[in-house]
């Protein structure tokens, strides 16, 4: 199991000078001379104005090992200064001056289904959320769905925050980390982390309801059990503002609702779009969605577009994610992309140069985070079927904010990784 140790290299100082050292190169080089490793979670604090040779070396290591995540120093530095660390997966924190109350995530995809069904849970066949009145019409109306979804999110935010308040209070009571807190300044800044799961499915579902016609298929009790989409609709992940503006609205709205509630020890509420591998578990309890996602299957991870939604290539997908403002998700916006080596170029040098150009463009648009995997799906399938092969004993992949040995994942998690989009074109 991960110990969540993260190592940061690179970054730009407040005075404008880069902070790349020879030791940064040495740390990165261990991934070549000692082999890929999930931990420490190797994180490059990226900025387009970092030394060109350093950016190329990072890209070279990414292509060779798929073991690096990149985070945008240009958006984090104004918030956290130039002496910050990455905790857990992608969350920035001022080193030695603050701590974070970890908050897992809320399943907004299931919340949307609650809104449609008046709070009724199809999985457990019981009333869970407040009964706002189920939608009885044959086709879903966008304004009606959004109104009920807004009420459901308000209820969920309150339940979420108050549950976390209880957890953090009891944790401090019975398991206060005194030795760790001794290393932090006396006047501690505390942040209250929350998170979002099912993000892209909610965005695509709202797009389907707004721009196409979504017919409701009901069960024997009259609840919406499935949906039939008539017509085309924009999907998040294709650089289409019709979908991407809904994505920004969803992130901003949920954070605003979180801020309506008192947080433990007056900590500052933040949120993230980060699921690690919990997207598989959340999916087991989430029914059919209006975007076409089937019941009980994994949700798309983090801020990634839904599986199969990206139809316009890698660059368009990155542009969509880059539109999500970091200020609304200071706990992190995790984006994991898998690129076929042939899509990046026909030689190591070409792949390295193209990846640097992709990173420069992506982060110059204000994006926060990127996991880079460079391999084809056939390699994943072979590793799943033949984990005993020597070449797979240390086969490391980026998942969602952290790295893991592929053969250490459960088969269910491996199948989820395999089902994710592998970009064949830029």
Language-model segments: what does each one mean?
Residues 1-426:
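Conserved catalytic cores of very large enzyme subunits
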């Amino acid at each position: 199991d991960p110990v969540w140790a993260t190592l940061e290299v690179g970054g730009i100082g407040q005075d404008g000078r880069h902070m790349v050292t020879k030791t940064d190169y040495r740390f990165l080089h261990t991934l070549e001379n000692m082999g890929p490793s999930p931990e420490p979670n190797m994180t490059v604090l990226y900025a387009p104005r970092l030394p060109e040779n350093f950016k190329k070396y990072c890209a070279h290591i990414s292509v060779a090992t798929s073991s690096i995540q990149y985070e945008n120093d240009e958006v984090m530095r104004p918030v956290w200064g130039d002496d910050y660390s990455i905790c857990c997966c992608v969350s920035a924190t001022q080193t030695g001056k603050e701590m974070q109350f970890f908050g897992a995530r809320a399943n907004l995809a299931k919340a949307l289904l609650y809104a449609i069904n008046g709070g009724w849970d199809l999985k457990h066949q019981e009333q869970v959320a407040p009964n706002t009145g189920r939608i009885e019409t044959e086709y879903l109306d966008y304004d009606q769905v959004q109104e009920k979804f807004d009420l459901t999110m308000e209820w969920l935010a309150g339940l979420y925050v108050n549950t976390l308040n209880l957890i953090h209070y009891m944790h401090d009571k019975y398991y206060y980390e005194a030795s760790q807190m001794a290393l932090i300044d006396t006047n501690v800044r505390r942040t209250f982390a929350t998170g979002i799961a099912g993000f892209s499915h909610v965005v695509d579902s709202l797009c389907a309801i707004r721009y196409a016609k979504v017919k409701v298929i009901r069960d024997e009790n009259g609840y919406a059990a499935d949906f039939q989409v008539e017509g085309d609709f924009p999907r998040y992940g294709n650089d289409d503002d019709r979908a991407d503006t809904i994505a920004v609205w969803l992130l901003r709205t949920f954070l605003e609702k979180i801020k309506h509630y008192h947080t433990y020890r007056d900590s500052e509420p933040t949120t993230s779009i980060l699921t690690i591998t919990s997207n598989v578990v959340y999916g087991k309890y989430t029914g059919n969605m209006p975007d076409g996602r089937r019941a009980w299957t994994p949700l798309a991870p983090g801020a990634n577009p839904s599986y199969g939604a990206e139809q316009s290539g890698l660059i368009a997908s990155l542009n969509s994610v880059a539109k999500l403002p970091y200020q609304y998700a200071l706990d992190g916006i995790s984006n994991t992309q898998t690129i076929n080596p042939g899509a990046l170029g026909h030689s190591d040098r070409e792949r390295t140069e193209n990846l640097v150009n992709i990173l420069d463009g992506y982060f110059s648009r204000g994006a926060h985070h990127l996991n880079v995997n460079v391999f084809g799906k056939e390699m994943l399938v072979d590793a799943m079927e033949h984990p005993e092969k020597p070449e797979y004993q240390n086969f490391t992949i980026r998942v969602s904010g952290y790295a893991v040995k592929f053969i250490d994942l459960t088969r269910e998690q491996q199948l989820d990784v395999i089902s994710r989009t592998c970009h064949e074109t830029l």
